[in-house]
Protein backbone atom coordinates (compact mmCIF):
# COMPACT_ATOMS: atom_id res chain seq x y z
CA UNK A 1 0.00 0.00 0.00
CA UNK A 2 1.57 3.30 -1.10
CA UNK A 3 1.10 6.32 1.17
CA UNK A 4 0.42 9.48 -0.82
CA UNK A 5 -0.40 13.12 -0.05
CA UNK A 6 -2.09 14.36 3.09
CA UNK A 7 -5.83 14.66 2.53
CA UNK A 8 -6.86 16.18 5.85
CA UNK A 9 -5.25 17.27 9.12
CA UNK A 10 -7.45 17.16 12.18
CA UNK A 11 -6.74 18.10 15.79
CA UNK A 12 -4.99 14.81 16.63
CA UNK A 13 -4.87 12.75 13.41
CA UNK A 14 -3.74 13.19 9.82
CA UNK A 15 -5.41 11.40 6.92
CA UNK A 16 -3.45 10.33 3.84
CA UNK A 17 -4.51 9.09 0.43
CA UNK A 18 -3.18 5.77 -0.82
CA UNK A 19 -2.86 4.12 -4.24
CA UNK A 20 -6.21 2.42 -3.50
CA UNK A 21 -9.18 4.77 -4.02
CA UNK A 22 -11.12 2.90 -1.30
CA UNK A 23 -8.44 3.07 1.39
CA UNK A 24 -6.83 5.78 3.53
CA UNK A 25 -4.05 5.85 6.11
CA UNK A 26 -4.71 7.40 9.52
CA UNK A 27 -1.69 8.85 11.32
CA UNK A 28 -2.23 9.31 15.06
CA UNK A 29 -0.17 12.29 16.26
CA UNK A 30 0.93 13.24 19.78
CA UNK A 31 -1.18 16.41 19.61
CA UNK A 32 -3.72 16.65 22.41
CA UNK A 33 -6.47 19.25 22.18
CA UNK A 34 -9.30 20.52 24.33
CA UNK A 35 -12.06 23.11 24.10
CA UNK A 36 -12.63 22.66 20.35
CA UNK A 37 -8.95 22.97 19.53
CA UNK A 38 -8.33 26.15 21.54
CA UNK A 39 -5.73 24.37 23.69
CA UNK A 40 -3.23 22.00 22.07
CA UNK A 41 -0.20 20.29 23.64
CA UNK A 42 2.15 17.47 22.68
CA UNK A 43 2.02 14.37 24.88
CA UNK A 44 4.75 11.80 24.33
CA UNK A 45 3.56 8.29 23.28
CA UNK A 46 -0.05 9.43 22.77
CA UNK A 47 -0.16 8.70 19.02
CA UNK A 48 1.06 5.15 19.53
CA UNK A 49 -1.23 4.45 22.49
CA UNK A 50 -4.35 5.74 20.74
CA UNK A 51 -3.56 3.96 17.47
CA UNK A 52 -3.16 0.59 19.17
CA UNK A 53 -6.08 1.20 21.55
CA UNK A 54 -8.33 2.06 18.61
CA UNK A 55 -7.24 -1.04 16.69
CA UNK A 56 -8.05 -3.25 19.69
CA UNK A 57 -11.51 -1.73 20.21
CA UNK A 58 -12.42 -1.73 16.52
CA UNK A 59 -11.50 -5.41 16.25
CA UNK A 60 -13.70 -6.21 19.28
CA UNK A 61 -16.58 -4.35 17.65
CA UNK A 62 -16.07 -6.15 14.34
CA UNK A 63 -16.18 -9.47 16.21
CA UNK A 64 -19.56 -8.37 17.61
CA UNK A 65 -20.90 -7.73 14.10
CA UNK A 66 -20.47 -3.95 14.04
CA UNK A 67 -19.02 -2.72 10.72
CA UNK A 68 -16.03 -0.39 11.16
CA UNK A 69 -13.65 1.42 8.86
CA UNK A 70 -10.62 -0.26 10.45
CA UNK A 71 -8.58 -2.63 8.26
CA UNK A 72 -5.22 -3.18 9.93
CA UNK A 73 -2.33 -1.64 11.83
CA UNK A 74 0.53 -0.39 9.66
CA UNK A 75 2.91 0.66 12.43
CA UNK A 76 3.08 2.22 15.87
CA UNK A 77 1.08 5.30 14.91
CA UNK A 78 -0.56 4.41 11.58
CA UNK A 79 -3.44 2.22 10.45
CA UNK A 80 -5.18 1.42 7.19
CA UNK A 81 -8.89 2.24 6.98
CA UNK A 82 -11.73 2.24 4.49
CA UNK A 83 -12.46 5.59 2.85
CA UNK A 84 -15.87 6.64 4.11
CA UNK A 85 -18.19 9.42 3.03
CA UNK A 86 -18.47 10.88 6.52
CA UNK A 87 -21.72 12.12 8.03
CA UNK A 88 -20.96 15.38 9.93
CA UNK A 89 -22.80 14.30 13.07
CA UNK A 90 -21.44 13.02 16.38
CA UNK A 91 -23.50 10.38 18.18
CA UNK A 92 -23.06 10.56 21.96
CA UNK A 93 -24.15 7.79 24.32
CA UNK A 94 -24.15 8.56 28.05
CA UNK A 95 -24.36 6.00 30.85
CA UNK A 96 -23.47 8.46 33.64
CA UNK A 97 -23.84 12.23 33.84
CA UNK A 98 -20.68 14.13 32.95
CA UNK A 99 -19.37 16.86 30.67
CA UNK A 100 -21.81 19.03 28.75
CA UNK A 101 -24.85 17.16 30.11
CA UNK A 102 -23.99 18.32 33.62
CA UNK A 103 -23.57 21.92 32.43
CA UNK A 104 -26.74 21.95 30.32
CA UNK A 105 -29.13 20.32 32.78
CA UNK A 106 -27.53 20.83 36.18
CA UNK A 107 -27.33 17.10 36.86
CA UNK A 108 -24.81 15.98 39.48
CA UNK A 109 -21.70 14.50 37.88
CA UNK A 110 -21.62 10.72 38.20
CA UNK A 111 -25.40 10.25 38.34
CA UNK A 112 -26.24 6.91 36.72
CA UNK A 113 -28.58 7.34 33.77
CA UNK A 114 -31.21 4.62 33.47
CA UNK A 115 -31.65 4.08 30.65
CA UNK A 116 -28.64 5.55 28.84
CA UNK A 117 -29.19 8.71 26.79
CA UNK A 118 -28.48 9.15 23.07
CA UNK A 119 -27.66 12.61 21.71
CA UNK A 120 -26.60 14.19 18.42
CA UNK A 121 -24.13 17.03 17.88
CA UNK A 122 -23.11 18.77 14.67
CA UNK A 123 -19.42 18.18 13.99
CA UNK A 124 -18.31 21.81 13.60
CA UNK A 125 -15.53 23.18 15.81
CA UNK A 126 -16.16 26.77 14.69
CA UNK A 127 -19.71 26.55 16.03
CA UNK A 128 -18.70 24.61 19.15
CA UNK A 129 -20.21 21.28 18.01
CA UNK A 130 -23.81 22.39 18.76
CA UNK A 131 -26.46 20.06 20.17
CA UNK A 132 -28.94 19.10 17.41
CA UNK A 133 -31.81 16.69 16.84
CA UNK A 134 -32.88 14.23 14.16
CA UNK A 135 -35.04 16.73 12.29
CA UNK A 136 -32.09 19.12 11.94
CA UNK A 137 -29.99 16.35 10.40
CA UNK A 138 -32.62 15.52 7.80
CA UNK A 139 -33.74 19.11 7.11
CA UNK A 140 -30.21 20.35 6.45
CA UNK A 141 -29.16 17.31 4.46
CA UNK A 142 -26.47 16.08 6.84
CA UNK A 143 -27.98 12.59 6.76
CA UNK A 144 -31.19 10.70 6.02
CA UNK A 145 -33.81 9.38 8.42
CA UNK A 146 -32.79 5.84 7.49
CA UNK A 147 -29.12 6.58 8.20
CA UNK A 148 -30.02 8.03 11.59
CA UNK A 149 -31.94 4.90 12.54
CA UNK A 150 -28.92 2.75 11.67
CA UNK A 151 -26.49 5.09 13.44
CA UNK A 152 -28.53 4.92 16.64
CA UNK A 153 -28.87 1.14 16.35
CA UNK A 154 -25.11 0.72 15.98
CA UNK A 155 -24.35 3.21 18.77
CA UNK A 156 -26.53 1.24 21.18
CA UNK A 157 -24.84 -2.00 20.17
CA UNK A 158 -21.41 -0.43 20.67
CA UNK A 159 -22.53 0.60 24.16
CA UNK A 160 -23.65 -2.94 24.99
CA UNK A 161 -20.36 -4.46 23.82
CA UNK A 162 -18.02 -1.91 25.37
CA UNK A 163 -19.85 -1.45 28.68
CA UNK A 164 -19.18 -5.12 29.42
CA UNK A 165 -15.61 -4.98 28.08
CA UNK A 166 -14.69 -2.05 30.31
CA UNK A 167 -16.66 -3.39 33.29
CA UNK A 168 -14.62 -6.59 33.14
CA UNK A 169 -11.51 -4.38 33.35
CA UNK A 170 -12.80 -2.56 36.44
CA UNK A 171 -13.83 0.55 34.52
CA UNK A 172 -17.06 2.50 34.04
CA UNK A 173 -17.83 3.58 30.49
CA UNK A 174 -19.30 6.96 31.42
CA UNK A 175 -19.97 8.25 27.91
CA UNK A 176 -18.52 8.25 24.40
CA UNK A 177 -18.90 9.80 20.97
CA UNK A 178 -19.04 8.00 17.65
CA UNK A 179 -18.84 9.14 14.05
CA UNK A 180 -20.23 7.27 11.08
CA UNK A 181 -19.81 7.31 7.33
CA UNK A 182 -21.01 5.50 4.25
CA UNK A 183 -18.93 2.83 2.48
CA UNK A 184 -20.43 1.26 -0.63
CA UNK A 185 -23.93 2.15 0.57
CA UNK A 186 -23.48 0.81 4.12
CA UNK A 187 -23.33 2.81 7.36
CA UNK A 188 -19.94 2.10 8.93
CA UNK A 189 -18.34 3.24 12.21
CA UNK A 190 -15.54 5.69 11.42
CA UNK A 191 -13.01 7.94 13.12
CA UNK A 192 -11.55 6.34 16.28
CA UNK A 193 -12.39 4.95 19.70
CA UNK A 194 -9.83 5.92 22.34
CA UNK A 195 -9.70 7.69 25.72
CA UNK A 196 -9.71 10.93 23.69
CA UNK A 197 -13.35 10.40 22.73
CA UNK A 198 -14.88 8.71 25.75
CA UNK A 199 -14.98 9.02 29.52
CA UNK A 200 -13.66 6.16 31.60
CA UNK A 201 -13.62 6.04 35.40
CA UNK A 202 -12.18 3.47 37.76
CA UNK A 203 -15.16 1.47 39.01
CA UNK A 204 -14.12 1.61 42.67
CA UNK A 205 -12.48 5.02 43.08
CA UNK A 206 -14.15 6.98 40.23
CA UNK A 207 -10.67 8.14 39.21
CA UNK A 208 -10.84 9.71 35.75
CA UNK A 209 -8.83 7.74 33.18
CA UNK A 210 -9.55 9.71 30.00
CA UNK A 211 -8.95 13.10 28.33
CA UNK A 212 -10.68 14.89 31.21
CA UNK A 213 -7.30 14.53 32.91
CA UNK A 214 -5.97 16.91 30.24
CA UNK A 215 -9.03 19.18 30.13
CA UNK A 216 -9.09 19.57 33.92
CA UNK A 217 -5.32 19.74 34.47
CA UNK A 218 -5.19 16.53 36.53
CA UNK A 219 -1.90 15.35 35.03
CA UNK A 220 -0.63 11.85 34.18
CA UNK A 221 -2.76 11.77 31.03
CA UNK A 222 -0.82 9.18 29.04
CA UNK A 223 -0.12 7.13 32.14
CA UNK A 224 -3.90 6.83 32.63
CA UNK A 225 -4.40 5.89 28.96
CA UNK A 226 -1.72 3.22 29.30
CA UNK A 227 -3.27 1.86 32.48
CA UNK A 228 -6.63 1.49 30.72
CA UNK A 229 -4.92 -0.23 27.79
CA UNK A 230 -3.08 -2.60 30.11
CA UNK A 231 -6.27 -3.51 31.99
CA UNK A 232 -7.95 -4.37 28.68
CA UNK A 233 -4.97 -6.35 27.43
CA UNK A 234 -4.15 -3.98 24.56
CA UNK A 235 -0.66 -4.84 23.25
CA UNK A 236 1.32 -1.60 23.36
Curated annotation (Swiss-Prot):
GO MF term list: ATP binding; phosphoribosylaminoimidazolesuccinocarboxamide synthase activity
CDD domains recorded: SAICAR_synt_PurC (cd01415)
EC number, UniProt record: 6.3.2.6
Keyword annotations from UniProtKB, A to Z: ATP-binding, Ligase, Nucleotide-binding, Purine biosynthesis
GO BP annotations listed: 'de novo' IMP biosynthetic process; cobalamin biosynthetic process
GO cellular component terms, semicolon-separated: cytosol
PANTHER family: MULTIFUNCTIONAL PROTEIN ADE2 (PTHR43599), SI:DKEY-6E2.2 (PTHR43599:SF3)
Protein name stated in the entry: Phosphoribosylaminoimidazole-succinocarboxamide synthase
Species of provenance: Pseudomonas syringae pv. tomato (strain ATCC BAA-871 / DC3000)
Gene this protein is translated from: purC
Amino acid sequence: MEKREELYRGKAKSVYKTDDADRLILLFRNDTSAFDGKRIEQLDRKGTVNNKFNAFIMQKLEEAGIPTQFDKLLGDNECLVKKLDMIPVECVVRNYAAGSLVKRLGIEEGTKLNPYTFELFLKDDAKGDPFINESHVVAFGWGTAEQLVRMKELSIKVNEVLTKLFDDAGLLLVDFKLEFGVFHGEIVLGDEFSPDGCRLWDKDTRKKMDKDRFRQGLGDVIEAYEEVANRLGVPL
